């Protein structure tokens, strides 16, 4: 009985977790307002492609890695280096709780992503961005988006 209740609650949480998808153009506008267009040489389409390949625009996505660390939020920021999840050792270079990276208010996420991109490797720190976005035409990510 307890096991069935746990499965039911876990399933409900997964459904809620999947419901925090931001529209591509809404994200573009927020990123533009936070001065990410051209930040460290990366365009808005780079950021949109990153958000898509990492989380499919899911602000509340959490993913466990084989090393026991977790990736959080729309950019899947890793707990081993960038945020504190209070579960495993973290360098916490962004000085932020990992749970803040799941907030619909993307300011903490954006500040942390800026810190990551400003360091060695830039967006190449995200393997999925390297595999699916780097060196590809990305302008279509802005199709239909009006920033003004």
From Swiss-Prot:
It comes from the Eukaryota. It catalyses: Hydrolysis of (1->4)-beta-linkages between N-acetylmuramic acid and N-acetyl-D-glucosamine residues in a peptidoglycan and between N-acetyl-D-glucosamine residues in chitodextrins. GO terms for biological process: defense response to bacterium; fertilization; fusion of sperm to egg plasma membrane involved in single fertilization; killing of cells of another organism. The keyword Disulfide bond applies. Gene3D superfamilies: 1.10.530.10. The active site is at residues 54, 71. Glycans are attached at residue 58. Expressed strongly in testis and epididymis and weakly in seminal vesicle, vas deferens, kidney and spleen. Highly expressed in primary spermatocytes and round spermatids (at protein level). Residues 20-148 form the C-type lysozyme domain. SMART domains: LYZ1. Its main location: secreted. GO terms for molecular function: lysozyme activity. It is an enzyme of class 3 (hydrolase). May be involved sperm-egg plasma membrane adhesion and fusion during fertilization. Exhibits bacteriolytic activity in vitro against Micrococcus luteus and Staphylococcus aureus. Shows weak bacteriolytic activity against Gram-positive bacteria at physiological pH. Bacteriolytic activity is pH-dependent, with a maximum at around pH 5.6. Monomer. This is Lysozyme-like protein 6. It comes from Mus musculus (Mouse). The lineage of its organism: Eukaryota, Metazoa, Chordata, Craniata, Vertebrata. The gene is Lyzl6.
């Amino acid at each position: 009985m307890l096991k069935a209740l746990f499965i039911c609650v876990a399933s409900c949480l997964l459904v809620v977790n999947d419901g925090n998808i931001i529209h591509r153009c809404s994200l573009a506008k927020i990123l533009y307002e936070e001065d990410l267009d051209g930040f460290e040489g990366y365009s808005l389409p780079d950021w949109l492609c990153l958000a898509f390949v990492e989380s499919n625009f899911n602000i509340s996505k959490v993913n466990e890695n084989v090393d026991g660390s977790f990736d959080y939020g729309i950019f899947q920021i890793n707990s081993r280096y960038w945020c504190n999840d209070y579960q495993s050792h973290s360098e916490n270079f962004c000085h932020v709780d990992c749970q803040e990276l799941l907030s619909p208010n993307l300011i903490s996420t954006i500040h942390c992503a800026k810190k990551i991109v400003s360091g060695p490797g830039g967006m190449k720190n995200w393997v999925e961005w390297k595999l699916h976005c780097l060196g590809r035409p990305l302008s279509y990510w802005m199709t239909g988006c009006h920033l003004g």
